[in-house]
Amino acid sequence: MLACYAPVPAFLLPPRRIGWTLRLGSAVLLALLQGAVQAATPDWSGVWAMQGGTVFDLATQTGKGGSTTPGVREHPPYTPAYEAKYLANMALRDKGILPDPNSFCGIPTGFPRILNLPDVYEFAVTPQQVWIIAENGPNVLRIYTDGRAHPAPADRWPTHTGDSVGHWEGDTLVFDTVSLHSSENGRTLVDRTGLMLSEAAHVVSRMHINAAGLMEVQMTIDDQQALSAPWVVTKQFKQQDKGARVYDYACNENNRNPVDPKTGWTYTIGPDGRIIDQSATKK
C-alpha cells in the first residue's frame, strides 16, 4: 500500500525546525545564485601568448594603410609637445641609448604595456575580479568587476597599473583604467620605441575571444595632455597547447648588466665579471 505525505504547514512545525528550514532554504538559494553568476563568466583558462612583436602599435611605425614612407606615421595622434618628446625618444632609440626602465627590470611594466610583453599570460576570471597575469616580471593587472566605481579623485594617485573597474557585456569584459603614471621622469614607457602617455591617460578596453579563437583586447586611449584624438590599439593572444605552463620568471635575477647613467648604454658582462663589448666608447 502506498502512503501519501502532504507537506506540513509551517505553523505546525516547532520554532527550531522552522529556523533550520529557513536557513537551509537560504543556503540553497545562495548557492544557486552563485552558480548562476559563475556560469555567466566565460572560460578564459589556459596559457596564452601575445601575437605579433613588441611594438605596441604597428601604425606608429608605418603610414596610413601600411605605407612605409620614411618619416610618415599614422599613429599616435600626439599633440605637438608630445610629438617632440616622442621624436626625441626615437632619436635615442636609434642610437641604442633610450632610457627604458623596463629593459633592465627597473620598475613594474605598468598598463597598457603589460598587454605588450613577449612571454605568456594567464587570464583568471571570477565574479568579483579579473586578473591579467604576465609571466614576464611577473606583472599583474587587477580589474574589479563587483560593481564598485573608481575611488574619488582625492583618494587615488598615479600607479604603474592604475585603477581598473569593469563589467560584462555578454562574453566581453569592458574595463576602464585611470590613475596611471606619466611616461616621464623614469617611469615606464608604452613600448621599446619610446611611446609615451601622461598622467591624464584614460583607457577603455574591450576584451573577448573573437571568432578565430584569439583573445582580443581593443584599447581606446584618451589623453588630453598627450593626444589630439583617441588612439585605438588592438592586441591579440593565442591559446597555447593544453598542459602549457607559466614558469617562475624573476626579471631582476637576470639583471646583471649595468647601465652607464651618462650614456644610457647597457654593458655586456662576461663570466669573469668584466665588460666584453665596446658600448662605453660609443657616442
Predicted regions and their residues:
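Compositionally biased low-complexity segments enriched in histidine and/or tyrosine
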Residues: 7-9, 207
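PEST-like low-complexity, intrinsically disordered acidic/proline/serine-rich tracts
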Residues: 38-283
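Bacterial N-terminal signal peptides
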Residues: 9, 14-19, 23-35
